[in-house]
């Protein structure tokens, strides 16, 4: 029997405050199947879903079957997002490379479009991972009232209210704020590190290069000379033999 979700109190984040600003280019672009007018619009929607879930999808990461089903109207955007979340790429990149707490943070950001409210919410969803498993957490987040009220079945999730008026910089994008791997796995993979295998040479302009006969060419040789000093040994007065030192007449 699965444990009920642990209660946690939401806090007044930006996503819980209704926006009153005039629409501008800073507002996030909403991709939904309700205003698809051409095949290029569907391509943009699919790319937006890949960016939201994977941040960057390579050619071998793409789910061609799910894309075809979405284009033909066999599945909704919510089903397409669910398929990406349950794919091997997402599982290998986020679930297997992070702890349950870190994985919960990634899922809340990517699915609900916000940060976790507190450590208590992080613990609550991590209990779901422990009791219902990896797929159980994905289903519970997609079936939650918060997801359905904000994105429904036809809208790609996005980071809600990242840019705010009156501030020079808004909230950081989730892909920068929360890297794919935590610090432990980044150390396992050996980065960040700098490996420099080439010889470091100093660039000298042509007009400053030394020509033949320039005394500066011999500066290195002069510095390398270490002449031995001719030191005079010190003799104590008590060790001087006066009788032996005075010549005989």
Swiss-Prot record:
Function text: Rod-core linker protein required for attachment of rods with the core of the major allophycocyanins in phycobilisomes, plays a major role in light harvesting. Although able to transfer energy to both photosystems, this is predominantly a PSII antenna. Involved in state transitions.
Family stated for the protein in its record: Belongs to the phycobilisome linker protein family.
Intracellular or extracellular location(s): Cellular thylakoid membrane
Membrane topology classification: Peripheral membrane protein
Record-annotated disulphide pairs: none
Organism: Synechocystis sp. (strain ATCC 27184 / PCC 6803 / Kazusa)
Gene Ontology biological process terms in this record: photosynthesis
Coiled coil location: none
Gene: cpcG
Keywords: Antenna complex, Membrane, Phycobilisome, Thylakoid
Domain PBS-linker, chain residue ranges per copy: 11-188
GO cellular component terms attached to this protein's record: phycobilisome; plasma membrane-derived thylakoid membrane
Knockout mutant characteristics: Decreased growth rate, decreased energy transfer to photosystem II. Decreased accumulation of phycocyanin (PC), loss of the phycobilisome supercomplex and major phycobiliproteins ApcE and allophycocyanin. A double cpcG1/cpcG2 deletion has even less PC, but grows slightly better than this single mutant. Unable to perform state 2 to state 1 transitions (i.e. cannot transfer energy to PSII).
Protein name: Phycobilisome rod-core linker polypeptide CpcG
The UniProt record lists the keyword Membrane: yes
Pfam families xrefs: PBS_linker_poly (PF00427)
Gene3D superfamilies on file: Phycobilisome linker domain
UniProt key word Protein biosynthesis: no
PANTHER family linked to this entry: PHYCOBILISOME 32.1 KDA LINKER POLYPEPTIDE, PHYCOCYANIN-ASSOCIATED, ROD 2-RELATED (PTHR34011)
InterPro entries: PBS_linker_dom (IPR001297), PBS_linker_sf (IPR038255), Phycobilisome (IPR016470)
Subunit structure: Part of the phycobilisome, a hemidiscoidal structure that is composed of two distinct substructures: a core complex and a number of rods radiating from the core. This protein is part of a conventional PBS rod (called CpcG-PBS) with on average 3 stacked phycocyanin hexamers (PC, CpcA and CpcB). Linker CpcG connects the PC stack to the thylakoid, the hexamers are linked by 1 copy of CpcC1, 1 copy of CpcC2 and the stack is terminated by a single copy of CpcD. Ferredoxin--NADP reductase (petH) is also part of the complex.
């Amino acid at each position: 029997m699965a444990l009920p979700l642990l209660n946690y109190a939401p806090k007044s984040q930006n996503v819980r405050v209704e926006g009153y600003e005039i629409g501008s280019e800073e507002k996030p672009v909403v991709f939904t199947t309700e205003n698809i007018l051409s095949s290029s619009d569907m391509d943009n929607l699919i790319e937006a879903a890949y960016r939201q879930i994977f941040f960057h999808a390579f050619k071998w990461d793409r789910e061609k079957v799910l894309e075809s089903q979405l284009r033909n109207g066999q599945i909704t955007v919510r089903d397409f997002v669910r398929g990406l979340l349950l794919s091997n790429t997402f599982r290998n990149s986020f679930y297997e490379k992070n702890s349950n707490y870190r994985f919960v943070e990634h899922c809340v950001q990517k699915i609900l479009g916000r940060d976790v409210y507190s450590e208590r919410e992080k613990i609550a969803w991590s209990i779901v991972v422990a009791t219902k498993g990896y797929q159980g957490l994905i289903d519970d987040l997609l079936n939650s009232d918060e997801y359905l009220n904000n994105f429904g079945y036809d809208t790609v999730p996005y980071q809600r209210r990242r840019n705010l008026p009156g501030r020079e910089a808004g909230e950081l994008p989730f892909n920068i704020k929360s890297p794919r791997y935590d610090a432990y796995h980044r150390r396992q993979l050996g980065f960040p590190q700098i490996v420099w295998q080439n010889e470091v040479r100093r660039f000298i302009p042509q007009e400053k290069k030394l020509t033949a006969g320039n005394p500066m060419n011999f500066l290195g040789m002069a510095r390398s000379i270490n002449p031995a000093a001719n030191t005079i040994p010190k003799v104590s007065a008590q060790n001087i033999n006066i009788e032996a030192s005075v010549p005989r007449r």
